[in-house]
Amino acid sequence: MVNNMTDLTAQEPAWQTRDHLDDPVIGELRNRFGPDAFTVQATRTGVPVVWIKREQLLEVGDFLKKLPKPYVMLFDLHGMDERLRTHREGLPAADFSVFYHLISIDRNRDIMLKVALAENDLHVPTFTKLFPNANWYERETWDLFGITFDGHPNLRRIMMPQTWKGHPLRKDYPARATEFSPFELTKAKQDLEMEALTFKPEEWGMKRGTENEDFMFLNLGPNHPSAHGAFRIVLQLDGEEIVDCVPDIGYHHRGAEKMGERQSWHSYIPYTDRIEYLGGCVNEMPYVLAVEKLAGITVPDRVNVIRVMLSELFRINSHLLYISTFIQDVGAMTPVFFAFTDRQKIYDLVEAITGFRMHPAWFRIGGVAHDLPRGWDRLLREFLDWMPKRLASYEKAALQNTILKGRSQGVAAYGAKEALEWGTTGAGLRATGIDFDVRKARPYSGYENFDFEIPVGGGVSDCYTRVMLKVEELRQSLRILEQCLNNMPEGPFKADHPLTTPPPKERTLQHIETLITHFLQVSWGPVMPANESFQMVEATKGINSYYLTSDGSTMSYRTRIRTPSYAHLQQIPAAIRGSLVSDLIVYLGSIDFVMSDVDR
């Protein structure tokens, strides 16, 4: 690690509002479709944002996918209710909009396409013909906004129950329980809900049998221990062979994006911890960075290193649970108990620094909650001396076991093409040989100042390769923590900026104006300038991102959370068809997901 850490204030701020007209893809689009074919929106997302006509969508998408350095991954797709948005200067008229976020690995660049829709014509052609992973994203957008995707293979609810009325992310849909009538579960309603959960194969394009045999349909979950949460997979079986399967999600849906519209920018931080409840501060990182882009805040170097340190501690904590439970899914119990001993040491350190364990809610807009306590370095030193030997013992005792290898090598295998088509990120993508880790490819919070490697597989992502990459990632996180320990900068733990929240208490004592300013910022929350911002991070399970829209208020107009687990579960049928039920159990253990991350 560089001892004289980079002065980030001397660099071009990441929060500048830009239209990205200098991005090569804008020129390529204009050359193909004409200079007046679309509207370019200036934002603080860090990517070109281009409004196109609905009729151009598939043609533009196909063009981007076939460029010499193509946009090969549909990273995200969702909608927005634009009807109450007041700051829309220069944008096409729209009651609703749909956005498509595409990534080019070769260019290491993104582009966001937007389509404007009128309330009386909420139709847009399905994107599944170009990107198969658009399936779930379009279902969710229809479920929560009521936007119809013409030609979609099975446009039905995915987050809400099939019997639900209305579309919750619309602005005219209530955001608080007190706005609803008291909930009553009558016998008739209970029977209706149970009937709605009955799986009908024909609705999913499945056959109940052939001339010579009948298929068996088996519910795995939503209460099966190997489902790793409230998650159901309906299996179509020929003997023990999986002919097809349908993942059924939404049981853990809490309306996290809707909550973002009624919490202040500051008070939403605790909710971010619970999106992926094992990641802790890792989940706070993309949110606070996106808010800081809106606010125009550049944090001190000490804040960057503290944030990296906490993120890597939680990465190790999550990986330890993942590795040990994977081994347990295959059939060995002992490593789980050893791993919880190691995780307790991390929790002791996290608790000493933040005051909390799993959900610290410790990052702040402009910094962290408080400075590092005395003795933090001793606790970290003890952990760094302890963990490498333990990791070696796991690898020797369990991960090199011939039975475990036989159960996991070659199981649920896919290549780079399939990974990109399904929006796979994290170890699942890197196992295919694609070297893409956001900490290296698009450094944030000072990761460019750290010396560490990105483990990459040999071309095929199977269960065993994914697990072994996580083991090596754990070692690299230990390297990063060592550098944090040896090179922690001096300086403040918060930025000196008017929108840093909470503001310094001592400024309230100057005169009545500063007291009122402090009172409003703490009670109502800071007012963020009207704009859009975006931040992705390499989270514990893949790429996690927040796409925030501010309308110049104390609360977010739209909070879009893209989680890696959502994309990874959608890929299950494509990766497991033709395998056995026992292989599915191993595959689920190798994905590394929690349902709170999927359902939000």
UniProtKB/Swiss-Prot annotation:
GO terms for molecular function: NAD binding; NADH dehydrogenase (ubiquinone) activity; NADH:ubiquinone reductase (non-electrogenic) activity; quinone binding. It catalyses: a quinone + NADH + 5 H(+)(in) = a quinol + NAD(+) + 4 H(+)(out). Its EC number is 7.1.1.-. Its main location: membrane. SUPFAM superfamilies: HydB/Nqo4-like (SSF56762), Nqo5-like (SSF143243). It holds the Pfam family Complex1_30kDa. The keyword Ribonucleoprotein does not apply. It is a peripheral membrane protein. Residues 1-190 are annotated as: NADH dehydrogenase I subunit C. The keyword Protein biosynthesis does not apply. It comes from the Bacteria. It is found in: Cell inner membrane. It is an enzyme of class 7 (translocase). Residues 214-600 are annotated as: NADH dehydrogenase I subunit D. GO terms for cellular component: NADH dehydrogenase complex; plasma membrane. Keywords: Cell inner membrane, Cell membrane, Membrane, Multifunctional enzyme, NAD, Quinone, Translocase, Transport, Ubiquinone. NDH-1 is composed of 13 different subunits. Subunits NuoB, CD, E, F, and G constitute the peripheral sector of the complex. NDH-1 shuttles electrons from NADH, via FMN and iron-sulfur (Fe-S) centers, to quinones in the respiratory chain. The immediate electron acceptor for the enzyme in this species is believed to be ubiquinone. Couples the redox reaction to proton translocation (for every two electrons transferred, four hydrogen ions are translocated across the cytoplasmic membrane), and thus conserves the redox energy in a proton gradient. In the N-terminal section; belongs to the complex I 30 kDa subunit family. HAMAP family: NDH1_NuoC (MF_01357), NDH1_NuoCD_1 (MF_01359), NDH1_NuoD (MF_01358). This is NADH-quinone oxidoreductase subunit C/D. It comes from Escherichia coli O1:K1 / APEC.
